Amino acid sequence: MIALIQRVKQAKVDVDGQTIGAIDKGLLVLLGVEREDDQAKMEKLATKVMSYRIFSDEDGKMNLNLKQVGGSLLVVSQFTLAADTGRGLRPSFSGAGTPEQAKQLYQAFVDYCAAQGVPVQTGEFAADMQVSLVNDGPVTFNLQV
């Protein structure tokens, strides 16, 4: 399971010209599911995302996590993160989870984070989405479990 996380000042996701999810300070999470992923991997990744210390403390050091700064999550499904780009000029998605598996784990990720008290907004699974953000830093990390 892969999460590309970006520290943002604000982010939103639109579908068909309508904003369906928006946050101010927090993390934009692009979430990719791979074939071997399961509930345990999802929980491990969700915990890591929420606990990852990428917000600055009073000394300017990355020492605070999402909950410590009162931030929110915008979680967007992104199957292309599971692409194999090692050969050729066209990505292969053979390692990506099935749509059913990905949808279930995506929703479980959202629910798990919300249950931990983190405000969560989402995109629409498998929709054509337009994501806008103001990246803070920029600070971007690729987390994988």
UniProtKB/Swiss-Prot annotation:
Its main location: cytoplasm. One of its GO terms (cellular component) is cytoplasm. Keywords: Cytoplasm, Hydrolase, RNA-binding, tRNA-binding. The keyword Cytoplasm applies. Its EC number is 3.1.1.96. One of its GO terms (molecular function) is tRNA binding. A motif (Gly-cisPro motif, important for rejection of L-amino acids) lies at residues 137-138. It catalyses: glycyl-tRNA(Ala) + H2O = tRNA(Ala) + glycine + H(+); a D-aminoacyl-tRNA + H2O = a tRNA + a D-alpha-amino acid + H(+). GO terms for biological process: D-amino acid catabolic process. It is found in: Cytoplasm. Homodimer. An aminoacyl-tRNA editing enzyme that deacylates mischarged D-aminoacyl-tRNAs. Also deacylates mischarged glycyl-tRNA(Ala), protecting cells against glycine mischarging by AlaRS. Acts via tRNA-based rather than protein-based catalysis; rejects L-amino acids rather than detecting D-amino acids in the active site. By recycling D-aminoacyl-tRNA to D-amino acids and free tRNA molecules, this enzyme counteracts the toxicity associated with the formation of D-aminoacyl-tRNA entities in vivo and helps enforce protein L-homochirality. PANTHER family: D-AMINOACYL-TRNA DEACYLASE 1, D-TYROSYL-TRNA TYR DEACYLASE. Belongs to the DTD family. A Gly-cisPro motif from one monomer fits into the active site of the other monomer to allow specific chiral rejection of L-amino acids. This is D-aminoacyl-tRNA deacylase. The lineage of its organism: Bacteria, Pseudomonadati, Pseudomonadota, Gammaproteobacteria, Alteromonadales.
